[in-house]
A protein has these predicted regions:
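Catalytic-site signature of metal-activated, phosphate-bearing donor transferases
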Residues: 1-129, 136, 151
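Alpha-helical transmembrane segments and their immediate juxtamembrane flanks
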Residues: 130-154
């Protein structure tokens, strides 16, 4: 759902490339005229679930960092669920992903899960003190307890 209008600059003269912009979906900055192709390109990016999970792990944190920097309100479980449900609704029904059958509905579900992962990561980034700091403190408390009880000798 809603991938048919995804205009991406694909072809340009290499010597006209000035650089790139964006962190999630990078776009070239180049000198030259732009034209739109009349035919769609076949975009076979979703090879298997494992590759999709690796790709999601890479880009969801980038999106979460950018979103966390721009957000003013705290992420709640309700917000996470609402974002996932609405993403599925948009992809599957509003943008008619259901017309692609099971693959379209699965893709809508994957996009909804990714949206929730982004907001879960924003939630993690909003935690003060950080989860890593809290866990380090708990681990130290356990080590201290074990030392006192004579279970470890560090």
């Amino acid at each position: 759902g809603n991938w048919q209008h995804d205009y991406v600059t694909r072809i340009f003269k290499k010597e006209n490339l000035k650089g790139w912009r964006g962190t999630i979906h990078e776009s070239p900055i180049y000198f030259g005229q732009e034209i739109k192709l009349k035919q769609s390109l076949i975009h076979l990016t979703h090879r298997n679930t494992q590759d999709n999970l690796r790709k999601s792990a890479d880009w969801t944190i980038k999106e979460a960092v950018a979103l966390e920097a721009a957000m003013v309100k705290k992420v709640t479980l309700r917000l996470i669920l609402r974002k996932g449900i609405m993403e599925f609704y948009r992809r599957a029904f509003k943008y008619q992903g259901y017309k692609d059958g099971v693959p379209g509905l699965i893709e809508a579900l994957v996009q909804a899960i990714n949206r929730m992962i982004v907001y879960i990561q924003v939630w993690e980034l909003q935690q003060k003190p950080s989860i890593a700091t809290r866990y380090a403190k708990i681990e130290q408390e356990i080590k201290n307890l074990w030392r006192r009880e004579g279970k470890i000798n560090l």
